[in-house]
Curated annotation (Swiss-Prot):
It comes from the Viruses. This is Uncharacterized protein ORF59b. It comes from Acidianus filamentous virus 1 (isolate United States/Yellowstone). GO terms for biological process: regulation of DNA-templated transcription. Disulfide bonds: none annotated.
Length: 59
């Protein structure tokens, strides 16, 4: 895996740490899952839009 560095404010870091502790995960695991879920959700939205356009074209 490659390393990526970025800055977060104290409030976000506190939320991240609380979530990680509650779920027994590391910060990195929480961040990876959050990014994966966000990207997956966005791609699914795009797929739904494409599917709707294709359905309209078929009719």
């Amino acid at each position: 895996m490659r390393k990526v560095a970025f800055k977060v404010n104290e409030d976000l870091l506190e939320l991240l740490d609380k979530y990680a502790i509650k779920h027994g995960l590391s910060r990195s695991e929480v961040i990876r899952e959050a990014i994966k879920n966000m990207v997956k959700e966005e791609l699914e939205k795009d797929s739904i839009i494409v599917a709707r356009v294709e359905k309209i074209r078929i009719w």
